[in-house]
């Protein structure tokens, strides 16, 4: 059985706090499948509960990841896994690009920027969410650079999930919904069956987060004409 995210008005009000950026349509951009759950699952849950619609652009098939036994073609399985995980998280629209996993930093930033800008337009996003470059690898840094350029061109804010203590960061408290949020996050991560051997470590990391998520701006609303200024 899986647990899926839903939106209820009384719960949505609980997340209309100053700590959560205001958004109607959130686009998450990731380097590889699984990050939408393991890294962004908490913030995406909060946005979904606040009433925002969610979309996802994953730039690679994650074909270089180590896989659990029993799977012969990881690149064929992972797009299906991300669709299942997205459904559990309440993400309504998913695009998976086919850039080479492990080589995102070798693509021209302008090429990745164009792909992200297209997704912003396609899904009418008014906020973009990524993994902060200081918490990921060189692929995540490449995504953050391209997303920054795309957000500036599209005139939408760009938020990043980061770690505590980073300059300019703030915390989002999932509050009473934390237990449900983490259960949904873990259920979505478990949808990536090719990565089942890594699941216990991921669950341990999520458990250590408790009810808190840490975010910071890469492109703040103050840099985007016509956008409301939010925390940070």
Residue spans for each PLM region:
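A conserved beta-strand->alpha-helix junction
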Residues: 59, 87-100
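Short, solvent-exposed amphipathic alpha-helices that sit
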Residues: 74-89, 145-150
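ATP-dependent adenylation/pyrophosphate-handling site
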Residues: 15, 22-73
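Metal-dependent de-N-acetylase/amidase catalytic core
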Residues: 1-29, 93, 102, 106-232
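Short, hinge-like loop/turn segments at secondary-structure boundaries
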Residues: 71-75, 112-114
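Flexible loop residues that form catalytic
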Residues: 62, 99, 133
């Amino acid at each position: 059985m899986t647990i899926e995210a839903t939106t209820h008005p009384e719960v949505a009000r609980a997340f209309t706090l100053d700590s959560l950026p205001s958004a109607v349509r959130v686009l998450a951009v990731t380097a590889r499948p699984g990050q939408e759950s393991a890294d962004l699952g908490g913030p995406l849950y909060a946005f979904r509960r606040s009433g925002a619609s969610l979309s996802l652009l994953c730039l690679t098939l994650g074909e270089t990841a180590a896989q659990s036994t029993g799977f012969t073609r990881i690149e064929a399985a992972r797009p299906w896994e991300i669709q299942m995980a997205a459904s559990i998280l309440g993400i309504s629209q998913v695009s998976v690009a086919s850039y080479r996993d492990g080589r995102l930093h070798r693509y021209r930033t302008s090429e990745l920027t164009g792909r992200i800008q297209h997704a912003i337009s396609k899904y009418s996003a008014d906020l973009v969410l990524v993994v902060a470059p200081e918490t990921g690898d060189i692929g995540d840094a490449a995504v953050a650079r391209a997303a920054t350029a795309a957000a500036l061109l599209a005139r939408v804010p760009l938020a990043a999930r980061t770690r505590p203590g980073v300059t300019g960061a703030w915390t989002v408290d999932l509050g009473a919904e934390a237990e449900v949020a983490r259960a949904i996050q873990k259920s979505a991560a478990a949808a990536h069956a090719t990565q089942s051997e890594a699941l216990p470590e991921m669950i341990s990391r999520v458990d250590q987060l408790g009810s808190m998520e840490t975010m910071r701006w890469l492109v703040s609303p103050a840099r985007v004409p016509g956008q409301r200024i939010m925390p940070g």
